[in-house]
Curated annotation (Swiss-Prot):
Organism: Secale cereale
Pfam families: PSII
Complexes and interactors: PSII is composed of 1 copy each of membrane proteins PsbA, PsbB, PsbC, PsbD, PsbE, PsbF, PsbH, PsbI, PsbJ, PsbK, PsbL, PsbM, PsbT, PsbX, PsbY, PsbZ, Psb30/Ycf12, at least 3 peripheral proteins of the oxygen-evolving complex and a large number of cofactors. It forms dimeric complexes.
This protein's name: Photosystem II CP47 reaction center protein
Primary site of residence: plastid
Membrane topology label: Multi-pass membrane protein
Gene symbol of the encoding locus: psbB
Length: 508
């Protein structure tokens, strides 16, 4: 036939049986990829340290999605929370991966069957004997079934009525676990960070889908609307389906990048805005202040800070610190986190506490500046030593650690003080193992960044696809060169412009 690559799908345009076959094969490919990818990730995933080496640091992409839907255990005997399990059953990571691969195989066979037996009675119009599909009716069926699935997910799976619930955590990503969620029917259900909104919205949207599906099954579209929206043309279905997909892709790109109850930071890593706003830093200082108010020493107060919370407050976990073409997991960048060294407190020789100004997200290098509690610059690491006034040596800066591995250790030699001041620009200080994975020291993005980039990019491409196919179906007659007045009788000489009734000649 010699079709160009971008027109090869025309072979299934008027062939409902084989159109169905290629869609089943596509489902087989998607499901097969999901199952295979899950098995690959499970083969390389190290569950031994859920605090300092969680799934998102290791670049896991499908494991977080399984986990947020309630899968936490492995046939390998480990649990995502760090415990051990004995009999996880079919609803384990490997079990779900296996069911996807089995389903993929069944879809593969079904696709072959439908490709061979393409000329089914159900696809032919009984009046004309030609292949045809009742698209409005099919739309109603699909809407109804999607509504049932949506309602079932919200009413049973999420609520724990018949299912595990979903991953729920606190605002700082410390206490996450799979649990049942009650629907939130008040205004709080519209807060994207309230898990109850997931249940209530699925129940509401599912109910609407069921009712809309029944409506479209029982009511035929008006003739003008049917013709105006080209409801008899399969390319209309393609165009509107692409619209639904690109809209969903834009939405999930937003919920992933800005954060929401559907994208917990324990599974996908923190968002860049949590670094920009000092979100975890504020919580750490609040906890330390509370500890001091309870008459704890500074060392005791800092020692009570969970290592998990301190680790979030580190720029290497900011998904916007990755770069274009920097492939690999976060662990391949700055290394595998081994332990928290503790919180460094800097003081000048007058005893003032100094704070290192943190590096903004989009900087690769940043001057080392130490300010007091009023924001006045008191010390720095100068670019030109000859002109320096605030150098660590001149100001006599010392550093003492509270909490972590270096708890109670202090340094006064300028080289060591400057080393820890530089590292403080990047948030809390961690010991990182760069040898094991031959990590190159260049920051990588988390799966949060990859997911957002991928979905935003494809959403844009699919938006153009929607415009393209929508225009093709709406203006099909124009593109085909069919003029509604093509067979009109034209009297030569009557009009100045042939066939244009607005230019009638006046009789002299």
């Amino acid at each position: 036939m010699g079709l160009p690559w971008y027109r090869v799908h025309t072979v299934v345009l008027n062939d409902p049986g084989r159109l169905l076959a290629v869609h089943i094969m596509h489902t087989a490919l998607v499901s097969g990829w999901a199952g295979s990818m899950a098995l690959y990730e499970l083969a390389v995933f190290d569950p031994s340290d859920p605090v300092l080496d969680p799934m998102w640091r290791q670049g896991m992409f499908v494991i977080p999605f399984m986990t947020r839907l309630g899968i936490t255990d492995s046939w390998g005997g480990w649990s995502i929370s760090g415990g051990t399990v004995t009999n996880p059953g079919i609803w384990s990571y490997e079990g779900v991966a296996g069911t996807h691969i089995v389903f993929s195989g069944l879809c593969f066979l079904a696709a072959i069957w439908h490709w061979v037996y393409w000329d089914l009675e159900i696809f032919s119009d009984e009046r004309t004997g030609k292949p045809s599909l009742d698209l409005p009716k099919i739309f109603g069926i699909h809407l109804f079934l999607a509504g049932v699935a949506c309602f079932g997910f919200g009413a049973f799976h999420v609520t724990g009525l018949y299912g595990p619930g979903i991953w729920v955590s606190d605002p700082y990503g410390l206490t996450g676990k799979v649990q049942a969620v009650n629907p939130a029917w008040g205004a709080e259900g519209f807060d994207p960070f309230v898990p109850g909104g997931i249940a209530s919205h699925h129940i509401a949207a599912g109910t609407l889908g069921i009712l809309a599906g029944l409506f479209h099954l029982s009511v035929r579209p008006p003739q003008r609307l049917y013709k105006g929206l080209r409801m008899g043309n399969i390319e209309t279905v393609l165009s509107s389906s692409i619209a639904a997909v690109f809209f969903a892709a834009f939405v999930v790109a937003g919920t992933m990048w800005y954060g929401s109850a559907t994208t917990p930071i324990e599974l996908f890593g923190p968002t860049r805005y949590q670094w920009d706003q000092g979100y975890f830093q504020q919580e750490i200082y609040r906890r330390v202040s509370n500890g001091l108010a309870e008459n704890l020493s500074l060392s005791e107060a800092w020692s009570k800070i969970p290592e998990k919370l301190a680790f979030y407050d580190y720029i290497g976990n900011n998904p916007a610190k990755g770069g274009l073409f920097r492939a690999g997991s976060m662990d391949n960048g700055d290394g595998i986190a081994v332990g928290w060294l503790g919180h460094p407190v800097f003081r000048d020789k007058e005893g003032r506490e100094l704070f290192v100004r943190r590096m903004p997200t989009f900087f690769e290098t940043f001057p080392v500046v130490l300010v007091d509690e009023e924001g006045i610059v008191r010390a720095d690491v100068p670019f030109r030593r000859a002109e320096s006034k605030y150098s660590v040596e001149q100001v006599g800066v010392t550093v003492e650690f509270y909490g972590g591995e270096l708890n109670g250790v202090s340094y006064s030699d300028p080289a060591t003080v400057k080393k820890y001041a530089r590292r403080s620009q990047l948030g809390e200080i961690f010991e990182l193992d760069r040898a094991t994975l031959k990590s190159d020291g260049v920051f990588r993005s988390s799966p949060r960044g990859w997911f957002t980039f991928g979905h935003a990019t494809f959403a844009l491409l699919f938006f153009f696809g929607h415009i393209w196919h929508g225009a093709r179906t709406l203006f099909r007659d124009v593109f085909a060169g069919i003029d509604p007045d093509l067979d009109a009788q034209v009297e030569f000489g009557t009009f100045q412009k042939v066939g244009d009734p607005t230019t009638r000649k006046q009789a002299v």
